[in-house]
Amino acid sequence: XKNGYAVDSSGKAPECILSNYCNNECTKV
């Protein structure tokens, strides 16, 4: 999830950079 976006119920939440946060809940871009 590096340089990905946290997927929120309303769409896309703020950018996520931490790999421990960017996983299945992030769309990789």
UniProtKB/Swiss-Prot annotation:
One of its GO terms (molecular function) is toxin activity. Signal peptide: none annotated. It is found in: Secreted. Gene3D superfamilies: Knottin, scorpion toxin-like (3.30.30.10). GO terms for cellular component: extracellular region. It comes from the Eukaryota. Expressed by the venom gland. Keywords: Disulfide bond, Ion channel impairing toxin, Neurotoxin, Secreted, Toxin, Voltage-gated sodium channel impairing toxin. Its main location: secreted. InterPro entries: LCN-type_CS_alpha_beta_dom (IPR044062), Scorpion_toxin-like_sf (IPR036574). Has the structural arrangement of an alpha-helix connected to antiparallel beta-sheets by disulfide bonds (CS-alpha/beta). Belongs to the long (4 C-C) scorpion toxin superfamily. Sodium channel inhibitor family. Beta subfamily. Excitatory insect beta-toxins induce a spastic paralysis. They bind voltage-independently at site-4 of sodium channels (Nav) and shift the voltage of activation toward more negative potentials thereby affecting sodium channel activation and promoting spontaneous and repetitive firing. The fraction to which this protein belongs exhibits low toxicity and induces transient paralysis in all insects tested (the crickets A.domesticus). This is Toxin Bl-4.
